[in-house]
């Protein structure tokens, strides 16, 4: 691609534009040669890998067509041709007449160079910029030469003035002041210093008068404008951009081009500089260039000339738009807020805001958009100050709201405890009613049995009476016959001829009222139970509504053996802990029918998701708080030193005398002695050894004043009657309410949670679904089970589908949503399980027993001392303790019942193990629901994308047609690129400068695009040509 080779082969003669050679097609070469030539064509295109890979899939015919198309575009001139031409324009030895003749074609040569830089392949551009040709240096030198007379034109100087030459030399030397050495990295700084020294030598050798006249001739043409276009084309490559950014004079010369009289050139320069500002590291380089501009042009303030041009060029809208866009970007593309305010203030001092107020009503819509974009980005410092004050007010308001929320949280906690207490009370009443109902049922059964027995006896009595009535006439007849016979025979003869038993039969019968039937004999004992079944046929609980199968009798309960389930695929094993058949009776699992659930589930989907890939210590008891420190001292004076020191500290905290303390202990006065002090004082109960020493000291009648204050206190302290019991009683009195308030919510939580878990019908149905799916998975390997341990619920997340994207719990949540939507909020029936999970029931029961012992201690003390404080305490709190003890018994019974109901043992399963199972299950179930919803939304998005892609590819249904469509599209795109003058943007960072300029023309810059993530290039100093 590039300029066509002309017939003369002389650079600069014909216009350098891409033209097609005659369309005669050459015969196709051998395949090896064809591949070599095709590879060269691909490398010259600089295509991205995906499109190059697609071109390599062409057949030989299409490859040859592409080679022929590309070879019709031949590079007209090599890079050194243009470089030699530009160097000839800079030759100081050329006469003025000869220079006039040469300079006529300078603009034309520059235009051809710009087209070549824009349209030729990357190899041509690299050759132009390499160390041998140094095309960038030549371009920058020519640009500097083309505008060296501009300074004199602005100062109104004519050639021949010695002061002008001094100013010229000063201008050339000022190029050294690019920016402070610390502003750029070491490679930039070293290159800058070395090149700046060379630049000073170059400018100092320029013949002043002749060079000034030649420069004036060049400045009257479009050479500066085209030079900027050449530099823009070079910077559009990542490789060229890095070279321009690291060049010590290039950006400075571009900025100095703003002094050109052509508004179109100024607009081009500002567009390019604005694009560089948006490149990471570019903003600092642009500011350094304007610092250099200030020194060269003798500005009092930076950007002074720029604002002057902005105000004066009001007739050229394109320049004003470009200028406003550059000011917006150079001010607001930095991240540091303080620096943005500083740059903003620079332009404010130069009168930008006043000018914008005048220009806001301009007829140009583009200029209005740029002005509004700048105003939208402006930092209003006053507004920021108001915002800061508003923030402080808001923070104070937040503190008030947080305090209010804290109060509301406390109130909510109190309401929750009240609610839990009410629920627990209702549950206790329900349990009591259930007990009463069981008692009534038992009484009813006994009464029914007695009534049945009485009815049977009455019926038997009636039957016997009827038989007797029926037999009485016969008996009377027989009696009359017998009487007659006896009368004839005589009693003596009769008795001699009959046995005794027959004589009894002839005895007169008793009257009917005295005949009562005997009760039936007792029922025979039940037969012994048969021996247990072998392990291969485990018994099962009865399944209501299931098909009839083998029923085995074990004791008094019958269980039905579950038939194995045949699955289409092998399924993973669900490693649950199954309950034994003899553990099922009386549990929740005896009420479940998992076989009925299987009829409702989508088992085909379940098997497809979960088929295997390969197909073919007991708690420590808390001792009582009221321990006494029994440290035996073998050898002591009166009190051991450390013990006396600690006692003194404790007594100072109380601020009471020893007499006041002992008097308060006598009267159980907790107003004088707070309970905290009593508990501290209990650590200093006198030991037996200390009491002996104190008594001996007293018997010796030694003066008490010689004792230390601690010893005197201990002497009085030890004389208190029943000191240990009194101290323990005071501690109990002081802590009773706190203990009551602490234990009651825990017992209520256990009662409420136990009752709600046991009575939850939705939880039972959830377990039924889990049991059904688990049996379905395990039936072919382990056989069906009748129940499982609750810890098995944690394994639902470990059983994953074939693609590892879904767990068994996710499938259960999906099934519940589709088949059983009423169960979706099953956790609403489980009340206070989280609170119950934090309760140690064993410790709570021990604390209740401890309170009972403490209350018994108070009763004994009250019976001994008859103290009003103790009497009032007993009358007030005995009922509360009784209620607490009843609640403790109810909580224990309710918990034991619910644990046994789920097939667990209360001895091995405390509440801290039982209830957290449900807490974890609920939390995991909710997360599974959320993940299912997220997966559903993602699938819908993917489905919409797929439908959109299918709609676009209606004409490409088969793979061959799709490849053919892609190839045709790529060929058309390549031909469009060849016909255009703009260099195509392929991949990487190439083409970014053009992209930035294009975007900025369509969308005004806002401060949000200045964030680090929106930078277009990485730091240019850290890129070498391998990154291009």
Swiss-Prot record:
Residues 508-541 have a biased composition (Pro residues). Its main location: cytoplasm. Expressed in endothelial cells. One of its GO terms (molecular function) is GTPase activating protein binding. InterPro entries: ARM-like, ARM-type_fold, FH2_Formin, FH2_Formin_sf, FH3_dom, FMNL_animal, GBD/FH3_dom, GTPase-bd. It comes from the Eukaryota. Residues 986-1018 form the DAD domain. Keywords: Angiogenesis, Cell membrane, Cytoplasm, Developmental protein, Lipoprotein, Membrane, Myristate, Phosphoprotein. A lipid is attached at residue 2 (N-myristoyl glycine). One of its GO terms (biological process) is angiogenesis. Interacts with SRGAP2 (via SH3 domain). It is found in: Cytoplasm; Cell membrane. The DAD domain regulates activation via by an autoinhibitory interaction with the GBD/FH3 domain. This autoinhibition is released upon competitive binding of an activated GTPase. The release of DAD allows the FH2 domain to then nucleate and elongate nonbranched actin filaments. GO terms for cellular component: cytoplasm; cytosol; Golgi apparatus; intracellular membrane-bounded organelle; plasma membrane. Transmembrane segments: none annotated. The modification Phosphothreonine is found at residue 95. The keyword Lipoprotein applies. Pfam families: Drf_FH3, Drf_GBD, FH2. Plays a role in the regulation of cell morphology and cytoskeletal organization. Required in the control of cell shape and migration. Required for developmental angiogenesis. In this process, required for microtubule reorganization and for efficient endothelial cell elongation. In quiescent endothelial cells, triggers rearrangement of the actin cytoskeleton, but does not alter microtubule alignement. The modification Phosphoserine is found at residues 174, 1014. Residues 493-541 are annotated as: Disordered. It is a lipid-anchor. Residues 561-951 form the FH2 domain. This is Formin-like protein 3. Residues 26-472 form the GBD/FH3 domain. It comes from Homo sapiens (Human). The keyword Cell cycle does not apply.
């Amino acid at each position: 691609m590039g300029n066509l080779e002309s017939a003369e082969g002389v650079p600069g003669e014909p216009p350098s534009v891409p033209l097609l050679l005659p369309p005669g097609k050459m015969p196709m070469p051998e395949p090896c040669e064809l591949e070599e030539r095709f590879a060269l064509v691909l490398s010259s295109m600089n295509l991205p890998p995906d499109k190059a890979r697609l071109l390599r899939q062409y057949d030989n015919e299409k490859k040859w067509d592409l080679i022929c198309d590309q070879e019709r575009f031949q590079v007209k001139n090599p890079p050194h041709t243009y470089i030699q031409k530009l160097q000839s324009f800079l030759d100081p030895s050329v006469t003025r007449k000869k220079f006039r003749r040469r300079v006529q074609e300078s603009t034309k040569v520059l235009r051809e160079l710009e087209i070549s830089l824009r349209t030729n392949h990357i190899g041509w551009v690299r050759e132009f910029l390499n160390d041998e040709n140094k095309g960038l240096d030549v371009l920058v030198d020519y640009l500097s030469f083309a505008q060296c007379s501009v300074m004199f034109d602005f100062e109104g100087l004519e050639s021949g003035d010695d002061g002008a030459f001094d100013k010229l030399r000063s201008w050339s030397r000022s190029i050294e002041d690019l920016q402070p050495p610390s502003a750029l990295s070491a490679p930039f700084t070293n290159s800058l210093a070395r090149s700046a020294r060379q630049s000073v030598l170059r400018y100092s050798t320029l013949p002043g008068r002749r060079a000034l006249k030649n420069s004036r001739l060049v400045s009257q043409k479009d050479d500066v404008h085209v030079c900027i276009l050449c530099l823009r084309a070079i910077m559009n490559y990542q490789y060229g951009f890095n070279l321009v950014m690291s060049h010590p004079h290039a950006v400075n010369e571009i900025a100095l081009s703003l002094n050109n009289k052509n508004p179109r050139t100024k607009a081009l320069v500002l567009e390019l500089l604005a694009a560089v500002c948006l490149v990471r590291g570019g903003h600092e380089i642009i500011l350094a260039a304007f610092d250099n501009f200030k020194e060269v042009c003798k500005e009092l303030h930076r950007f002074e000339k720029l604002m002057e041009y902005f105000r004066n060029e009001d007739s050229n809208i394109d320049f004003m738009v470009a200028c406003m866009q550059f000011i917006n970007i150079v001010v607001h593309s930095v991240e540091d807020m303080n620096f943005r305010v500083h740059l903003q203030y620079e332009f404010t001092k130069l009168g930008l805001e006043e000018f914008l107020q005048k220009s806001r009503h301009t007829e140009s819509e583009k200029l209005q958009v740029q002005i509004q974009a700048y105003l939208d980005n402006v930092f209003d410092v006053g507004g920021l100050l108001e915002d800061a004050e508003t923030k402080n007010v808001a923070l104070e308001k937040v503190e008030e709201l947080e305090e209010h929320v804290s109060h509301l949280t406390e109130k909510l906690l109190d309401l929750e405890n009240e609610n839990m207490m009410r629920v627990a009370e209702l549950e206790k009443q329900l349990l009591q009613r259930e007990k009463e109902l069981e008692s009534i049922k038992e009484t009813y059964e006994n009464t029914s049995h007695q009534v049945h027995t009485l009815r049977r006896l009455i019926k038997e009595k009636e039957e016997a009476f009827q038989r007797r009535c029926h037999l009485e006439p016969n008996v009377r007849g027989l009696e009359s016959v017998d009487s007659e016979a006896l009368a004839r025979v005589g009693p003596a003869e009769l008795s001699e001829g009959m046995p005794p038993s027959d004589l009894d039969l002839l005895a007169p019968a008793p009257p009917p009222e005295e005949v009562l039937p005997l009760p039936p004999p007792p029922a025979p004992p039940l037969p012994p139970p048969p021996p247990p079944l072998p392990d291969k046929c485990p018994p099962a609980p009865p399944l209501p509504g299931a098909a009839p199968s083998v029923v085995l009798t074990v004791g008094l309960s019958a269980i039905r053996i579950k038939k194995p389930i045949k699955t289409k695929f092998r399924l993973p094993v669900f490693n649950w802990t199954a309950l034994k058949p003899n553990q099922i009776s009386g549990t929740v699992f005896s009420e479940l029918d998992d076989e009925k659930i299987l009829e409702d589930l989508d088992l085909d989907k379940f098997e497809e998701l979960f088929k295997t890939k390969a197909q073919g210590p007991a708690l420590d008891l808390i001792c009582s708080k009221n321990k006494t420190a029994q440290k035996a001292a073998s050898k002591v004076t009166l009190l051991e030193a450390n013990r006396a020191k600690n006692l003194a500290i404790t007594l100072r905290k109380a601020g009471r005398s020893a007499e006041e303390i002992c008097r308060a202990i006598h009267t159980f006065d907790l107003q004088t002695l707070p309970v905290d002090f009593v508990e501290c004082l209990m650590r200093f109960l006198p030991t037996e050894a200390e009491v002996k020493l104190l008594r001996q000291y007293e018997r010796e009648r030694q003066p008490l004043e010689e004792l230390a204050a601690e010893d005197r206190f201990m002497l009085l302290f030890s004389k208190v009657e029943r000191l240990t019991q009194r101290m323990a009683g005071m501690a109990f009195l002081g802590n009773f309410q706190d203990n009551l308030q602490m234990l009651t919510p825990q017992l209520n939580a256990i009662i409420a949670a136990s009752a709600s878990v046991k009575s939850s019908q939705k939880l039972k149905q959830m377990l039924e679904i889990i049991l059904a799916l688990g049996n379905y998975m395990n039936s072919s390997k382990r056989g069906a089970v009748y129940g499982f341990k609750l810890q098995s619920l944690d394994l639902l997340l470990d059983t994953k589908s074939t693609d590892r994207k879904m767990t068994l719990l996710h499938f259960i949540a999906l099934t519940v949503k589709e088949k059983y939507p009423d169960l979706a909020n099953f956790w609403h029936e489980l009340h206070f399980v989280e609170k119950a999970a934090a309760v140690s029931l064993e410790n709570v029961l021990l604390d209740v027993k401890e309170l009972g012992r403490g209350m018994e201690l108070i009763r004994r003390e009250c019976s001994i001392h008859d103290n009003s404080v103790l009497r009032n305490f007993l009358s007030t709190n005995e009922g509360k303790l009784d209620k607490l003890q009843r609640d403790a018994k109810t909580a224990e019974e309710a918990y034991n019942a619910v644990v046994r109901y789920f097939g667990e043992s209360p001895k091995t399963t405390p509440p801290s193990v039982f209830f957290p199972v449900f807490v974890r299950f609920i939390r995991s179930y909710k997360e599974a629901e959320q993940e299912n919803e997220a997966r559903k939304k993602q699938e819908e998005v993917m489905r919409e994308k797929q439908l959109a892609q299918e709609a676009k590819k209606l004409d490409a249904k088969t793979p061959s047609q799709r490849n053919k469509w892609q190839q045709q599209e790529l060929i058309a795109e390549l031909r469009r690129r060849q016909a255009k003058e703009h260099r195509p943007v392929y991949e990487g960072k190439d083409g970014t400068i053009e992209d930035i300029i294009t975007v900025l023309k369509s969308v005004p810059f806002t401060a949000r695009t200045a964030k680090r993530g929106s930078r277009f290039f990485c730091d240019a100093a850290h890129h070498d040509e391998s990154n291009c």
